[in-house]
C-alpha cells in the first residue's frame, strides 16, 4: 500500500513538472547549462520549476534498496495483477514506441530511480544519455527536447551504476564520443596488425589504419603516424606533415608531440632552428612523463647544451629513465642492439662490424639442420636476443634450444629453463619445467643452469626459499665468470640476504658483472655512486653509469633501423633517426649523423647548413671521447668547413687526439703543421719527432711517414742552404784537411764503383731477356676417318 501511495505521488509530481516546464520553456528558451556539469545544488535549481518538482519527487522516493525491494516483494505477493496495472499506468508518460507491449518482467528491469536531478536536463538544450533502457538508447532526450523525456532521464539516472558513462552530453558531444569510439576500434585494428606481423606490406597496411584513426583525431594514432612520417617508417617521409601533427598534439598536451616538436626546433628540420624553443618543448614533454624528453634533458644538463651544466640535474633525469629501463629487464636479458659507427666502417672496410652476412647465417642454419649442436645453440642465442643482423624470434630460439637439449647440450637446457621461467607468447611460464631444465644443466656444471637454480631458491620459484642454496649456486656460477651469478651475489651482499651485509663485496661483484655488460650491474653501481653507499659519492660517475643504462632502453632499437635505412640508400630517413638519437646523447648516433652530413648524402638539409650541423655533432661526439670526431674537428677548422679557417684551434684538436687517444693520424697532422709552421712556430725537429711517433703508433702510417721524412730531409737541406753563405763556404773549405791529401782518389774510386754497378746491372738485365726460338714443325692435321667400306655380301 505504501508503494502505491508513493507511485501516485510521483505521477502527480511528473504531471505538475510537465506543465511548469512548458511555460518555463517559452520564457527561458535561450537558457542552457553545461551538459557535463556536476550534480546541482539547491541554489543551482531554485529558479527552475521542473527542478523543484524533481527534487520533491526525489525526497518522496529516496529509500534504501533493501527497503524498496522488501516492499515490492510484499506487494507482489498480495496483489500482483493490480501492481501490473498500476506500474503500467505510472510509466505511461514515457514516450517509447510500444510501452504497452512490454511485459512485467521487462518493466521490472527498469532501474530503481535515485532521482538525482542533473543540471540542465529540464531545459530546452537537448541532451543525450549514453546508456540503454529497455535495450534502447534514449535518443528521445536529444531529438525534440521533450520535457517528460528529459525529466525521466534525470529521475532514473543511477549515479552509482552509470557514472562511468558521464552525465548528460549534448548532441555534439555524443557525436564526438561515437567518432572516438570508431577511431579507437580502427586504431586497435591497426596495432593488432602492426604487432603481429613482420612483413613490410602488412605493416604498411597497419599504418593505413592508423592514418585513418589519426584523421579522426585519435591521439595515440596521431603520435604513431607523426613519428612514422618523421622517420619514413612504412610511410613516405614528410617532415612538414609530421610538424603539423606535432603542433596539433602539443595543443592537446601530448608529451610525445611536445618532444617531437622540440626535436624539430633543436635540429632545424621544417622550422628555423631554436634551441630555446627546443628546451621549452623538451621540458614540457619531460613534465608529461616522456622518457625520451628526460633523456634529452639529462644529456643537455650533463654536457651543458643550451643550459648551465649541472650534474645534479642530469642525475635526476637520467635516474628516472634508468629506473624504467631497469624495471623492464627480463630474465633472458632482452634484445641486443649492435652499435655500428659509419666512419669506422668506411675507413676500414675489412673491419668486422659484428653483423652476420646472410650467407653465413644460412650456412649455420644448414649445420644446425644437419645436427651440429654448437650451431643450434648459437642460432638459439641469436634468435633469443636478436642482434648481429638477426631478428629476435622466440619460436626459432625455442626450436633450436630444444634440438640441442635433446642432444644433451647443457647450455641449451639452461636457456630453455630461462625461457620457461620468464614465459612468453611462445613458451608458457612454468616454474616446474624451468626447474627441471635448470637442475639438469646445473648437474652438468653449466653456470647458466646454476644461476637459474640459484634464482629459483632465492625467490621460491617451484621450490621453498632457501638462501643458503641460492648463495651456493650463485657462487658456483660466479666462479665460472657467468654475469648473472655475479650480479645476484652482489645483490645478496648489498641487501644482506642470506649473508651479512657487505657493500665492498657487493661493489666487487657488481663491477665484475658490469665488465660482462650486464645492464642491472651498471644500474646498481650507479645507485651506489649516486647515494654514496659503500663508495665515495660521485655524481659524475653515477651520471655516466645511469646514462649507460638509459642508452640500452627499447628506443635503442632505432639505431639498427637507422643503419638499415642507410644501407638501403635512404639517407634522409637515416639522418633524421640518427639526429633524434644524437639528441638523446648517443655518441654513435652523433658521429653517424655528422658523417652522413659530411658526405653530403642527405638532401633533407640545405647545402649551406650541412657543414655547420656536421661540425656541431662532430663536436658532441668528440666530447664523449670519439677519436675520429676529434680529428674531424681539427680538419674542419684547418680547411674552414662550416667555420672560419683557424689553424690554432685545429692544432689544439689534433694535440688532444694525440695525447688522449694516441691517434697516429693526429700525430702525423701535428708533424705536418710543425713542418709548415701552421698555427705554431715552424720547427723541423718537432715535425720529425711527431712523424716518428705516428710511425710507432700505427704500422699503417709507416709508408706515409717515410715519404714525409724524405720530403722533410729535402726541406731541411734547402733550409740549411738558404741559411748558409755558399760562396764563403767553398772558399773556407779545405778538402785536404777534410778528407786527406788523397781525397781525389777516394772520389774516383767511388765513381768507378758506381759505374761498375750500373754496368753489371745492365748486363744482368740483358741476359734475363729470353731468346726467341724458331718455331718447330707443326703437327700434321688429323686425318678424318671416312665411313667404313661395306663388305660385299658373301
From Swiss-Prot:
GO biological process: ERAD pathway; Notch signaling pathway; protein secretion; response to endoplasmic reticulum stress; retrograde protein transport, ER to cytosol; triglyceride metabolic process
Record keywords: Disulfide bond, Endoplasmic reticulum, Glycoprotein, Membrane, Notch signaling pathway, Repeat, Signal, Transmembrane, Transmembrane helix
Signal sequence bounds: 1-21
Residues bearing glycans: 195, 217, 272, 431, 608
Chief subcellular location: endoplasmic reticulum
Function (record text): Plays a role in the endoplasmic reticulum quality control (ERQC) system also called ER-associated degradation (ERAD) involved in ubiquitin-dependent degradation of misfolded endoplasmic reticulum proteins. Enhances SYVN1 stability. Plays a role in LPL maturation and secretion. Required for normal differentiation of the pancreas epithelium, and for normal exocrine function and survival of pancreatic cells. May play a role in Notch signaling.
Listed name of the protein: Protein sel-1 homolog 1
Organism: Rattus norvegicus (Rat)
Amino acid at each position: 500500500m505504501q508503494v502505491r501511495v508513493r507511485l501516485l505521488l510521483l505521477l502527480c509530481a511528473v504531471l505538475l513538472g510537465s506543465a511548469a516546464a512548458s511555460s518555463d520553456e517559452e520564457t527561458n528558451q535561450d537558457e542552457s547549462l553545461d551538459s557535463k556539469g556536476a550534480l546541482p545544488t539547491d541554489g543551482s535549481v531554485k529558479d527552475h520549476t521542473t527542478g523543484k518538482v524533481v527534487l520533491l519527487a526525489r525526497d518522496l522516493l529516496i529509500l534504501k534498496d533493501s527497503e524498496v525491494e522488501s516492499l515490492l516483494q510484499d506487494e507482489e505477493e498480495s496483489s500482483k495483477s493490480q501492481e501490473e496495472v498500476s506500474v503500467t499506468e505510472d510509466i505511461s508518460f514515457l514516450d517509447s514506441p510500444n510501452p504497452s507491449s512490454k511485459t512485467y518482467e521487462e518493466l521490472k528491469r527498469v532501474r530503481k530511480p535515485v532521482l538525482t536531478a542533473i543540471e540542465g536536463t529540464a531545459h530546452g538544450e537537448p541532451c543525450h544519455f549514453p546508456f540503454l533502457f529497455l535495450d534502447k538508447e534514449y535518443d528521445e532526450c536529444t531529438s525534440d527536447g521533450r520535457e517528460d523525456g528529459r525529466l525521466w532521464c534525470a529521475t532514473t539516472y543511477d549515479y552509482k551504476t552509470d557514472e562511468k558513462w558521464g552525465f548528460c552530453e549534448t548532441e555534439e558531444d555524443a557525436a564526438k564520443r561515437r567518432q572516438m569510439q570508431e577511431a579507437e576500434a580502427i586504431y586497435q585494428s591497426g596495432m593488432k596488425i602492426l604487432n603481429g606481423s613482420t612483413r613490410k606490406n602488412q605493416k604498411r597496411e597497419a599504418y593505413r589504419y592508423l592514418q585513418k584513426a589519426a584523421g579522426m583525431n585519435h591521439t595515440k594514432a596521431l603520435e604513431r603516424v607523426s613519428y612514422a612520417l618523421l622517420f619514413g617508417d612504412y610511410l613516405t617521409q614528410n617532415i612538414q606533415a609530421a610538424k603539423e601533427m606535432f603542433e596539433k598534439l602539443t595543443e592537446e598536451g601530448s608529451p610525445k608531440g611536445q618532444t617531437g616538436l622540440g626535436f624539430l626546433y633543436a635540429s632545424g628540420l621544417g622550422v628555423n632552428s631554436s634551441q630555446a624553443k627546443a628546451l621549452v618543448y623538451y621540458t614540457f614533454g619531460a613534465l608529461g612523463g616522456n622518457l625520451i624528453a628526460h633523456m634529452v634533458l639529462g644529456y643537455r644538463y650533463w654536457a651543458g647544451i643550451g643550459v648551465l651544466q649541472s650534474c645534479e640535474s642530469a642525475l635526476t633525469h637520467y635516474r628516472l629513465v634508468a629506473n624504467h629501463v631497469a624495471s623492464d629487464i627480463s630474465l633472458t636479458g632482452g634484445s641486443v642492439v649492435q652499435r655500428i659507427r659509419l666512419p669506422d666502417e668506411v675507413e676500414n672496410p675489412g673491419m668486422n662490424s659484428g653483423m652476420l652476412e646472410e650467407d653465413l647465417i644460412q650456412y649455420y642454419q644448414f649445420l644446425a639442420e644437419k645436427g651440429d649442436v654448437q650451431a643450434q645453440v648459437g642460432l638459439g642465442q641469436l634468435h633469443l636476443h636478436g642482434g648481429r643482423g638477426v631478428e629476435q624470434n622466440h619460436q626459432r630460439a625455442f626450436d633450436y634450444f630444444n634440438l640441442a637439449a635433446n642432444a644433451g647440450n647443457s647450455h641449451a637446457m639452461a636457456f630453455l629453463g630461462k625461457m620457461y621461467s620468464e614465459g612468453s607468447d611462445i613458451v608458457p611460464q612454468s616454474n616446474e619445467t624451468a626447474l627441471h631444465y635448470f637442475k639438469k644443466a646445473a648437474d652438468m656444471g653449466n653456470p647458466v643452469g646454476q644461476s637459474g637454480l640459484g634464482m629459483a631458491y632465492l625467490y621460491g620459484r617451484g621450490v621453498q626459499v632457501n638462501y643458503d642454496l641460492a648463495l651456493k649456486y650463485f657462487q658456483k656460477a660466479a666462479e665460472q665468470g657467468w654475469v648473472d651469478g655475479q650480479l645476484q651475489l652482489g645483490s645478496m651482499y648489498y641487501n644482506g640476504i642470506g649473508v651479512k651485509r657487505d657493500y665492498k663485496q657487493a661493489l666487487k661483484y657488481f663491477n665484475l658483472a658490469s665488465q660482462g655488460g650486464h645492464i642491472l650491474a651498471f644500474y646498481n653501481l650507479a645507485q651506489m655512486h649516486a647515494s654514496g653507499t659503500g663508495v665515495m659519492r660521485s655524481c659524475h660517475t653515477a651520471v655516466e653509469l645511469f646514462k649507460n643504462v638509459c642508452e640500452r632502453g627499447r628506443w635503442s632499437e632505432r639505431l639498427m633501423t637507422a643503419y638499415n635505412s642507410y644501407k638501403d640508400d635512404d639517407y634522409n630517413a637515416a639522418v633524421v633517426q640518427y639526429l633524434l638519437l644524437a639528441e638523446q646523447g648517443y655518441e654513435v648516433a652523433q658521429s653517424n649523423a655528422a658523417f652522413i652530413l659530411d658526405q653530403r648524402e642527405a638532401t633533407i638539409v640545405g647545402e649551406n647548413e650541412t657543414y655547420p650541423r656536421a661540425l656541431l655533432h662532430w663536436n658532441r661526439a668528440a666530447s664523449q671521447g670519439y677519436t675520429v670526431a676529434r680529428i674531424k674537428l681539427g680538419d674542419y677548422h684547418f680547411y674552414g668547413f662550416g667555420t672560419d679557417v683557424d689553424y690554432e684551434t685545429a692544432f689544439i684538436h689534433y694535440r688532444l687526439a694525440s695525447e688522449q687517444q694516441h691517434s697516429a693520424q693526429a700525430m702525423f697532422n701535428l708533424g705536418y703543421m710543425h713542418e709548415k709552421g701552421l698555427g705554431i712556430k715552424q720547427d723541423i725537429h718537432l715535425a720529425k719527432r711527431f712523424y716518428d711517433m705516428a710511425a710507432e703508433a700505427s704500422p699503417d702510417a709507416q709508408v706515409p711517414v717515410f715519404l714525409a721524412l724524405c720530403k722533410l730531409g729535402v726541406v731541411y737541406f734547402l733550409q740549411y742552404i738558404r741559411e748558409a753563405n755558399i760562396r764563403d763556404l767553398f772558399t773556407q773549405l779545405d778538402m785536404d784537411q777534410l778528407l786527406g791529401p788523397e781525397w781525389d782518389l777516394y772520389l774516383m774510386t767511388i765513381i768507378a764503383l758506381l759505374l761498375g754497378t750500373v754496368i753489371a746491372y745492365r748486363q744482368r738485365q740483358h741476359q734475363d731477356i729470353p731468346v726467341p726460338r724458331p718455331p718447330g714443325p707443326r703437327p700434321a692435321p688429323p686425318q678424318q676417318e671416312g665411313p667404313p667400306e661395306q663388305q660385299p655380301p658373301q
